Amino acid sequence: MHAISLLNSWLERNAVIGHRSRQSALLRVVEALLDGGKLALTQLGRARPGNAFIKHHIKAVDRLLGNSHLHNERRGIYAALCATLLARAERPIIVVDWCDCELGRELLILKAAVPIGGRAISLYEEVHPMRRYNNPRTHRQFLQRFHQMVPAHCHPIIVTDAGFRGPWFRDVEALDWDWVGRVRNSIKYFQPETQRWCDIRSLYRDATPRVRHIGLRCLSPRHRYWYRLYLVRAYQRRPGRPRKRKLYSSNDGLYRRLHRAPWLLATSLPHQRGAGALIMRAYKRRMEIEETFRDLKSHRWGFALRYAQTKNSKRLEMLLLIAVLATFILWLLGLAT
């Protein structure tokens, strides 16, 4: 397959895998995924090319997923991906988000990806247990490892959702990077006109489809974070859509309110002409990582990660690496056509 020879040349050029046999074994599993296999041990074994019995293919995939040497070389492969995808980008938009693996929510994926053409290609990802979800220490260690992979000439804009808050923004600024995030829920901000702490939801009534610069505001009476805020009503009702619809679940009303809530965006970027529209476009690209998560987990249109029954974080990280390499090579083939 031409795709595998292209990936083999890329791996050899970057010299990220220390042994030829490990590289060959990895390429065969990536080829199995490209040939219609799913991100599960037995599915990859059945689709793996070769004339051996299926049980031997499954055992070969099992050995690859548990290979400690290849797992240690994993960050070198991600660093090569960063060098390739960010080679000509000085101010790339990089989206960071959490995602569950649908394994009883026992394991979660923390991913950094660059949006390209409606999808986001992973630059680096880690697997953590549920107890480390949104943990500041986990976030800090993730940023430090990711910072070592990003080329020195890049000063990215990190885009996150409302789950990432003050400690995360502080750690991003410590790396001399910029960030764009969303502020939501019952957070207080200091109103200089009234000299009082007010709920940020009191700003929602002034939201319009045009981005409005609120200014530099102090949030949280306890921590005193200073953010530059922008407000926009991103949701607009489509013409012809009925105003009242039946609620199909108890959470439908909650999701509808969350979807229609205005965007209160915070950023470290300086305010200048056109900054509001730039920040809104950057935050809109955050949804591209959600599409990537769907492609990863969908059993019909994607790689069916939901079929992976492993509860070992290292083996799951190896499955994610296989998926990233398959996505990367498909993207390269798409550029060539």
Stretches with model-predicted labels:
Residues 28-32, 47-50, 80-83, 96-100, ...:
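Short secondary-structure capping/turn segments at boundaries of alpha-helices and beta-strands
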Residues 1-38, 76-77, 89-92, 103-106, ...:
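Single, function-defining residue in the core of a domain
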Residues 50-75, 236-250:
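Short N-terminal secondary-structure initiator segments
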Residues 58-118:
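Active-site-proximal, Lys/Arg-enriched surface segment
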Residues 18, 22-66:
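A structured, charge-rich N-terminal accessory region that forms the first stable segment of a protein
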